[in-house]
């Protein structure tokens, strides 16, 4: 079966980045199309799936069940808001900023540097965050930093 990479972390669902990617990974994994090496679930609390479900006050397994029942990303996010919590606009802005910068001058920097080298991108100065690395690994050009 042919594999497919998930959408970029930057895809927004009701202003929230990463959520669409998490749902994409859930759907691709269930269909047997998620390439090997992608992290899904909440076993490691530092991975983005775990952080996102905690941010929304959700149980990951319940989110998987709901996602596989079908519906748009927006419909599933509304279900999340009703089931867990609805972050304020300010909280979403803080979440988005955290993810956009993760790996840049923080406790995840060392692991990011190691992962860059393993992926063959050790010499790439344009890869400064985990989102940059995901984009590069999936054939997208990392985005220049912006404050928005």
Residue ranges and their predicted role:
Residues 1-8, 45-46, 77, 81, ...:
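Generic, low-specificity signal for short hydrophobic/alpha-helical stretches with a mild N-terminal bias
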Residues 2-41, 98-148:
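Polar/charged low-complexity regulatory segments
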Residues 16-19, 60, 73-74, 92, ...:
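Alpha-helix initiation and N-capping motif
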Residues 35-81:
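Amphipathic alpha-helical packing elements
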Residues 63-120:
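Amphipathic protein-protein interaction modules
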